[in-house]
Amino acid sequence: MEYLLIFISAIFVNNIVLSQFLGICPFLGVSKKVDTAIGMGGAIAFVLTLATIITWCVQKYVLDPFGLQYLQTLAFILVIAALVQMVEIILKKVSPALYQALGIFLPLITTNCAVLGVAIRVIQKDYNLLESVVYAFSTALGFALALIVFAGIREQQALVRIPKGMQGVAIVMVTAALLSLAFMGFSGVDGGLKSLFGLE
């Protein structure tokens, strides 16, 4: 049941982009079309989950035993950069159209604070490996969900007349704020589930 709570909390209650405001750059930059958003969500899910597994192992089996915790951020960034390079090579071969659509935002996953933030957060929360994987995958799903919903809204906005003063960045920011407010409606759900299943 603990895994279900982690899953629901990471997707809805503590959504990485809409309530913790990590990963805003790709959220705003790759959300013009749903198909691009799906591709970016998939790339983030792959990198985030795999990076969390590897960084957890690096922390537990290299940094902690040798007292090298001060190298955590540097080590995690190197792992994430290597994974992003791997994803970039795979996408270039498998789906050149998606690779072109993601453009500069694919290499920017390396510096995406959401990926690094999740890797560090699982260490801070002292999750075991399975909890870390569930948390990372759930966080990636939450990011993808927010990105796809936002892209769908932006596609619909392109079909309607928007007042001149609200065009461009203004309507994007207002829409992102409203989406964030909508996700705030899930706050307290994890606490309710904890009390329902007697996990408090």
In which residue ranges do the predicted regions lie?
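Helix-coil boundary and interhelical linker segments in multi-pass alpha-helical membrane proteins
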Residues: M1-L5, C57-Y70, I120-E131
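Juxtamembrane boundary at the C-terminal end of a transmembrane helix
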Residues: E2, A182-E200
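Structural signature of hydrophobic alpha-helical transmembrane segments
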Residues: Y3-L18, G67-A82, V134-A146
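Hydrophobic core segments of alpha-helical transmembrane domains in multi-pass membrane transport
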Residues: I6, V13, I44, T49, ...
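Generic transmembrane alpha-helix signature in multi-pass membrane proteins
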Residues: F21-G29, E88-V94, I104-L106, C113-D126
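C-terminal ends of transmembrane helices
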Residues: L22-T36, V84-L98, F150-R161
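Cytoplasmic-side transmembrane-helix entry/capping segments in multi-pass membrane proteins
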Residues: D35-F46, Y70-F76, L98-I109, P163-A170
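Ordered, amphipathic secondary-structure segments that act as subunit-interaction surfaces
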Residues: K60-G103
